[in-house]
């Protein structure tokens, strides 16, 4: 994770040494954008975006209950990279919303309608493009 030292989240993570990566979805798009723009110094983003704190299993900081995947992390190293600091971390727990699991326990990412952010734009994900190894399979 990369943060500028001016960011509120930078100081929270540096103080606790922990953070949670919450997978974001089309349903959470507005909250995702809002939380990326508005500082937690000024606003309770949980309340404003009607998000539910979820107790983490291994870290002291909460996850977002509405997120289909929560990845709990502990900081192992901080590297200064010019204007940003890179927080390297170890994943210590993962929680998955059971509504996206099939009967065999496989998580179906595509059902959660994940989004990605690149260069100021949000993108929808989820369309299957190919299975692992497709490039070397023999044509029938």
Over which residues does each language-model region extend?
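Basic, polyanion-binding surface patches
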Residues: 1-140
């Amino acid at each position: 994770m990369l943060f500028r030292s001016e960011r509120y989240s930078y100081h929270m993570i540096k103080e606790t040494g922990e953070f949670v990566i919450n997978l974001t979805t089309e349903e959470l798009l507005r909250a995702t954008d809002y939380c990326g723009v508005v500082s937690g110094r000024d606003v309770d983003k949980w309340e404003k975006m009607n998000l539910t704190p979820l107790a983490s299993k291994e870290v002291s900081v909460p996850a977002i209950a509405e997120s289909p995947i929560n990845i709990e992390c502990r900081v192992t190293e901080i590297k200064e990279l010019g204007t940003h600091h890179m927080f390297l971390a170890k994943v210590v727990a993962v929680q998955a919303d059971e509504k996206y699991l099939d009967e065999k326990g496989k998580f179906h990412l595509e059902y959660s309608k994940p989004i990605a952010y690149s260069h100021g734009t949000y993108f929808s994900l989820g369309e299957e493009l190919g299975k692992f190894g497709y490039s070397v399979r023999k044509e029938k």
